[in-house]
Structures are given as structure tokens and as C-alpha cells.
Regions:
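Extracellular glycan-modifying ectodomains
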Residues: 1-79
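Short acidic-hydrophobic catalytic motif
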Residues: 69-229
Length: 229
């Protein structure tokens, strides 16, 4: 009866967002007006604080609804991009798709290639992903969202941690390169391909808090290639 849509009107499992709140309060208002003879306290000095709250809400309501709608569109768009990421076999396509604020890319392992092994366009793609320091190391870790580094082992340690997701809706990510085997734990589960002689990469959907893809990289004829389990 309220018209609440579980796919668009909830902030989390227990709370509606501003779209759901408007539907709920509109329904409640109509129900009370139809079924009860309630006095109208608008412009009543005794309820002036309520009037102020209503006016403040009116000032921010439209912008809040637009922000929520944009968030929903971003999240829905992530589904389509995620499917394209999983189906991409060409690294140039794959790297372009994952370089998006809706995804976090976790990279770890042993990079067995250098810039001299790569054609220029692949060097450029790695730079765009903020992986320009990836070359030649056997203990590489970097956690990147939209080219922004949110975790790494720049101190030379064999592990790194970060919280990944959107706003306060995050999960823990721990990367461990001990024993020459890259492990990429997201919410306690290891999603790495586990290739000891390759760079391993995991793509995480920040909005839906799910793993989109897990791959490893290798070089062939100057081109970066994608491998999957």
C-alpha cells in the first residue's frame, strides 16, 4: 500500500532512505487524515519547533532525493559494468572498465616483467591504474579506487590492509604476500588466483560489496594478458 520498493527505497536492511521515508510519511499522513479528526496545529505557537523542522526539511528534501537517485543509478550502472569486466579478455578493455570509482582494484604478487617488456600503451594503462611502480618486484601490494591509493606496502612489509566499499558501508581487505604466495582476503575470504610467479588482481564492487573478478597478469609479445582460474 505504501508503494515502497525494496530495490530503491532502503538505505540498509533496517532503514529506508529519503525516497522510502517520503512514501512512508505520505502514506501515514493520508491514513491519519482519513481515519482521525486531528486538529491542525500549523501556525500554532505551541508547535513552532515542529513548523521549523518541516520548513528545514522542505529546503533540503529535493536535493536529498536527487542525491539518492544518483546513488541508485550509480549502483545499478555498476552491475552492467561488472558483467563487462568479467567477460573482458583483452587487458586494454578490462583496465579501462575497472578504472572507475564504483570499483576497488587490489593488486598483489610477483611482477616478472619490466617496462622494456611492454608496448607503450600497456605502460600507459598501468599508469592510469596508479600501478606505475609495479615493475620487477616480488612483493608488490596496492589497493586502489579510481586511481587513488587506499592501501599499499610502501614500507616494504609483506602485508597491507584497508576498508573497502562505499561511504560507511565497508568490509575489511587484507593482502598477504608471505611465503611468496599472494593472498587477497576480502571479509575473511581469499579471492586471489594464488599464482606465485604472477601479479594477482581482484576487482571489488564498492556499492554492492561483492567481488566482480579475480585475474592474474602475464606478458606475451609485449602485451599484458589476463588469466583466470
Amino acid at each position: 500500500e505504501m508503494g515502497i520498493d525494496f530495490s530503491t527505497d532502503f538505505y540498509n536492511i533496517n532503514h529506508v532512505n529519503s525516497l522510502g521515508a517520503r512514501k512512508y510519511t505520505d502514506f501515514l499522513e493520508n491514513y491519519l487524515c482519513l481515519n482521525y479528526n486531528l486538529p491542525d496545529h500549523r501556525d500554532d505557537a505551541t508547535y513552532s519547533e515542529w513548523q521549523t523542522l518541516a520548513e528545514n526539511y522542505a529546503l533540503t528534501s529535493d536535493s536529498s532525493q536527487v542525491a539518492v537517485q544518483n546513488l541508485i543509478e550509480n549502483a545499478n550502472g555498476a552491475f552492467e559494468i561488472a558483467e563487462n569486466i568479467r567477460n573482458a579478455d583483452d587487458f586494454t578493455v578490462w583496465a579501462t572498465l575497472v578504472n572507475d570509482e564504483r570499483f576497488t582494484v587490489i593488486t598483489a604478487g610477483n611482477c616478472g616483467f619490466s617496462t622494456i617488456d611492454l608496448k607503450p600503451q600497456y605502460i600507459s594503462l598501468l599508469r592510469q591504474l596508479n600501478l606505475c611502480d609495479i615493475y620487477g618486484g616480488d612483493n608488490y601490494i596496492k589497493i586502489v579506487r579510481n586511481a587513488d591509493v587506499i592501501g599499499s606496502n610502501a614500507d616494504g612489509s609483506c602485508s597491507a590492509t584497508a576498508n573497502i566499499g562505499h561511504n560507511q558501508q565497508t568490509v575489511p581487505c587484507t593482502v598477504d604476500n608471505n611465503n611468496s604466495m599472494a593472498a587477497i582476503y576480502i571479509d575473511g575470504i581469499n579471492y586471489s588466483c594464488g599464482n606465485s610467479s604472477n601479479i594477482n588482481m581482484v576487482v571489488f564492487d564498492n556499492y554492492h560489496r561483492t567481488v566482480v573478478d579475480t585475474v592474474y597478469l602475464y606478458v606475451e609479445d609485449g602485451m599484458i594478458k589476463i588469466g583466470r582460474k
